[in-house]
């Protein structure tokens, strides 16, 4: 039962911040800080009391250290299905830590609409935690989209003009268009996977464990894998679909930049590890050379362009493109050590 609370804490905390602004402008800051500290402490407690592994062996089936399942839209086989293992817990620990830091970063910087700012900040973090816990694909998509709208408001309302002179509205709109387009591709891939599985098994379900057993025709399998890859590649971001990141990073408030580079990019890498590779193992193996080539291009392109930047935030954005290239290569290298290295780099970046 603790898993829903990991998601509810940021959402409830955000609502309380919005309400509390009417009484005292400093109160939302303290509520946001308390919410993030509570999330981080709960994550540490789970880490200390559990026995976790990064991922089970392929032959052993799925083993969740903690699991929560509640019917939601039964007609379409959609449930509130949450699962926690070592990989998702590491990401939630990182989210809690950077959540605390992002509240501190915004303490003096944000002076207008403090309550609404912290509502958006905490709802981004709540959506991220939901992404890391969801093992129903519709629920995963729901949280994936939910964390994007507050990020748009964060950039559009509290951002500032970067060194290139582009406005915060332009950067926010570019971010929104790129991420919504990738979200649409992901939705089509999820619906395609569910439909093909329904045709072969007669069971309509969005559950991760059931879809892992889906028997997919070779061409369809590759096409659906590409849909997932493109959706995650935009968010990661992978060259050449990276152009939204430098603008969004430069124009975002400091707390937004912390969340963007520190957490949001990792949701895409997590999605590749959790969904793209296990759901489409053979197609992913065929596609691996292309993915690793894109990662290699990203490493050098991001590093060289970072050298030319005079704005610190844009420099960090391009270095993020470079670092996520290493993560992409690690994910598609096909060895346990490479995956562990990718996770370590995701934590360290």
Write out the residue ranges for each language-model feature.
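Hydrophobic alpha-helical transmembrane segments of multi-pass small-molecule transporters/permeases
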Residues: 1, 79-90, 133, 225-229, ...
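Transmembrane helix-loop-helix hairpins at membrane boundaries of multipass inner-membrane proteins
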Residues: 1-2, 16-119, 205, 209-213
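Alpha-helical transmembrane segments of integral membrane proteins
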Residues: 1-8, 26-37, 83-93, 115-119, ...
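Central hydrophobic cores of alpha-helical transmembrane segments in multi-pass inner-membrane proteins
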Residues: 4-19, 34-46, 92-106, 124-125, ...
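Functional transmembrane alpha-helices
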Residues: 10, 85, 136-156, 204-206, ...
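Membrane-interface elements of multi-pass transporters and channels
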Residues: 19-23, 27, 51-52, 108, ...
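Alpha-helical multi-pass transmembrane bundles of energy-transducing inner-membrane proteins
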Residues: 23-25, 119, 123, 127-216, ...
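Juxtamembrane/interfacial segments at transmembrane-helix boundaries in multi-pass membrane proteins
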Residues: 49-78, 164, 168-172, 177, ...
